[in-house]
């Protein structure tokens, strides 16, 4: 097997909220400004953090998830996505050892699968040498993790930094960065986490973070850590030589922005030409053979989505003509008859799915699931099993008695077993988030269905 050197480092945290995304954005911008081609990755299924990565690095950011993409393919997948970059920075998820059940897709698991060294971010606010005890615990917990050092965050003063550094020296943990507390260094939040970059302009904040990182992180030392990683399998271009055989419309705007770039690339690798359109701003779907509606925040744009009757009619007409339509989460909500917002207001939506979606104050589902098809769908025949992820605040309430449930689902953070999604011969809509890079057969099946429909037009 051919191998190539890919300098890479995981920026992990002790827990959520320690400043991983902020620091990674600063690192990406700083290395980019110094002339490095830097490629970013995010552990887990999160859609929002990679958007900040992209602004900072100037490149698409890719998710690394051992549930959505088979673990044995992750190294090759990673190498392919790293491409020609001379440095890869991987942002962890939650705490270093947190993930799904039995550590599935934890930062530690991904780091070991990729042979990537780890640097731990510690929020040092309101602690001194105790930070060293935390670092020692993380270092000792799993000796197979290549623990290389720490970045100290939210330090209050020179004296505060000195105390923490002295503690790290006692246990032999290198301090690669020491960042001072700065209220300007944060990202806006929403009920799913951070606010997407499609709704905010983080450029000024990233510039502030970049300057802080350049002066407070030893970028040369961090690069040496990344360069210590062993060579990896040579990358593979999955789209090379592929003949385009069908056009698929992809809904993309402020309301629908949750797409894994690798998932879209997987559709292209199967012969799809992707054509982007906006359910918010356009009056009709493009001339295509199939439609994809990703997740996002349609609940924040209900007035505009509801008032764009021309677009809704265009989608309904496509459905009546049996055009293949695939939707995830926010896309499912939009395809329903009505959406009830957080305040109880009701908005008319497309009406392809005979159900209403109701926003709830509490999170309804979160976690990794296995979805087994209860009937033939756009992604495969009855019995096809898919690995996906759910995270939503709304509930779907069918308006017909004989509702054609798409999947039987098992899993979640609180393990459950339930039916979900909607499936007909030409529509598949559910709360399930998939990465087609890990479901290539599903991607092929959908592209095949779109191509077949195109021949009937």
What are the residue ranges of the model-derived segments?
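C-terminal and late-domain segments of enzyme folds
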Residues: 111, 242-244, 256-268, 273, ...
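Phosphate-binding active sites in nucleotide-utilizing proteins
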Residues: 244-320
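A short helix->loop->beta-strand "cap" motif at the edges of active sites that frequently abuts
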Residues: 116, 173, 320-324
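Short, surface-exposed amphipathic charged segments that create phosphate/polyanion-binding patches used
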Residues: 78-79, 185-200, 289-293, 367-369
């Amino acid at each position: 097997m051919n191998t190539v050197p890919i300098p890479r480092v995981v920026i992990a945290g002790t827990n959520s909220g320690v400043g991983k995304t902020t620091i990674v954005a600063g690192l990406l911008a700083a290395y980019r400004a110094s002339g490095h081609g830097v490629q970013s990755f995010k552990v887990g299924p999160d859609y929002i953090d990679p958007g900040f990565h992209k602004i900072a690095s100037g490149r698409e950011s890719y998710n690394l998830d051992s549930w959505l993409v088979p673990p044995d393919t992750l190294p090759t997948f990673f190498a392919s996505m790293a491409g020609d970059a001379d440095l890869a920075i991987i942002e962890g998820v939650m705490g270093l050892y947190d993930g799904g059940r039995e550590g599935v897709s934890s930062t530690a698991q991904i780091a070991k699968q990729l042979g990537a060294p780890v640097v731990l971010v510690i929020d040092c606010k309101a602690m001194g040498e105790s930070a060293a005890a935390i670092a020692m615990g993380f270092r000792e917990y799993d000796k197979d993790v290549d623990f290389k050092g720490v970045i100290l965050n939210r330090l209050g003063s020179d004296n505060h930094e000195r105390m923490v550094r002295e503690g790290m020296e006692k246990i032999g943990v290198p301090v690669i960065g020491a960042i001072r507390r700065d209220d300007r260094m944060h990202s806006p939040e929403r009920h799913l986490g951070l606010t997407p970059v499609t709704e905010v302009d983080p450029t000024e904040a990233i510039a502030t973070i970049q300057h802080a990182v350049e002066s407070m992180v030893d970028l040369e030392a961090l690069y040496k850590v990344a360069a210590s990683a062993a060579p990896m399998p040579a990358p593979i271009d999955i789209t090379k030589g592929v003949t385009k055989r069908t056009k698929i419309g992809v809904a993309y705007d402020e309301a629908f922005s949750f797409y894994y770039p690798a998932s879209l690339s997987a559709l292209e690798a199967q012969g799809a030409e992707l054509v982007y359109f906006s359910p918010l701003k356009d009056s009709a779907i493009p001339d295509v053979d199939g439609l994809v509606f990703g997740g996002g925040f349609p609940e924040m744009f209900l007035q505009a989505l509801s008032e764009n009757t021309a677009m809704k009619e265009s989608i309904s007409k496509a459905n009546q003509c049996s055009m293949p339509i695939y939707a995830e989460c926010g896309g499912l909500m939009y395809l329903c008859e009505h959406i009830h917002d957080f305040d109880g207001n009701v908005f008319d939506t497309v009406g392809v799915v005979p159900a209403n979606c109701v926003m709830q104050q509490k999170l309804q589902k979160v976690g990794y699931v296995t979805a087994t098809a209860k009937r033939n769908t756009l992604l495969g025949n009855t019995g096809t099993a898919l690995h996906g992820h759910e995270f939503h605040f709304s509930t779907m309430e069918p308006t017909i008695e004989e509702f054609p449930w798409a999947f039987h689902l098992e899993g979640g953070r609180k393990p459950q077993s339930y039916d979900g999604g909607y499936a007909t011969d030409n529509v598949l809509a559910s709360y399930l988030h998939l990465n087609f890079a890990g479901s290539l057969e599903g991607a092929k099946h959908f592209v095949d269905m779109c191509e077949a429909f195109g021949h009937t037009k």
